[in-house]
Amino acid sequence: STGSLGVDLALGVGGLPRGRVVEIFGPESSGKTTLCLEAIAQCQKNGGICAFIDAEHAFDPIYARKLGVKVEELYLSQPDTGEQALEICDTLVRSGGIDMVVVDSVAALVPKAEIEGEMGDSHVGLQARLMSQALRKLTGHIKRTNTLVVFINQIRMKIGVMFGSPETTTGGNALKFYASVRLDIRRTGQIKKGDDVIGNETKVKVIKNKVAPPFRQAEFDILYGEGISWEGELIDL
């Protein structure tokens, strides 16, 4: 389960599918990490073991705890390079002892050559190559051990696009192909109590779904410091 009734329904299989790669992408502070932490909390509730690969070095244990994550039972890794992050992910998946791995985020998976290089050096296509190599290797292991791997991704603007959407996700095209489910998450409005903003209205679209019909959507509220609002969802549904 994702911790959101609406998203579980939109996914068509009652939650995120195991043994698959899932991509959750959206603009900054749209609720990507919140949705993943909610899913981790649900997985742990059912006795699952979860890992969080924090390439952004932005994991907040206090917030995670508020969302119901058992932080002391969570495998947390803060790798230095993209290679290291994906190697850790592969090792965790191959072990067969982990139910769910979250990688936060693809944009922060910086290749070693880029970290060690000079500021002005050109490293075109390095990250895309890294992702496609890693996913080729990972997919088989994921299927075999029935692990769920979630990649969080950011949105970038393509320059000079005349028609079609100018938005693209980072890390090349490999993830688009290898992901069985792709979720597009957006903040659509604010929730106010008097004059104070207490949360965000959020919309999730299932852009790609290989395990159920795609293009369904869900709307829910994320309250600051609390996570997804169950009551709000029940009323809406």
UniProtKB/Swiss-Prot annotation:
Gene Ontology biological-process entries: DNA recombination; DNA repair; SOS response
ATP-binding as UniProt keyword: yes
Keyword Electron transport on entry: no
InterPro entries: AAA+_ATPase (IPR003593), DNA_recomb/repair_RecA (IPR013765), DNA_recomb/repair_RecA_CS (IPR020584), P-loop_NTPase (IPR027417), RecA-like_N (IPR049428), RecA_ATP-bd (IPR020588), RecA_monomer-monomer_interface (IPR020587)
Major location (coarse): cytoplasm
Any one Gene Ontology molecular-function term assigned to this protein's record: ATP hydrolysis activity
CDD domains: RecA (cd00983)
GO cellular component: cytosol
Listed SMART domains: AAA (SM00382)
Pfam families assigned to the protein according to its UniProt record, in alphabetical order: RecA
Residues engaged in binding ATP: G26, P27, E28, S29, S30, G31, K32, T33
Keywords on record: ATP-binding, Cytoplasm, DNA damage, DNA recombination, DNA repair, DNA-binding, Nucleotide-binding, SOS response
Localization terms from the record: Cytoplasm
Biological function: Can catalyze the hydrolysis of ATP in the presence of single-stranded DNA, the ATP-dependent uptake of single-stranded DNA by duplex DNA, and the ATP-dependent hybridization of homologous single-stranded DNAs. It interacts with LexA causing its activation and leading to its autocatalytic cleavage.
Family to which the UniProt record says this protein belongs: Belongs to the RecA family.
Protein name: Protein RecA
Organism in which the protein naturally occurs: Neisseria perflava
Gene this chain is encoded by: recA
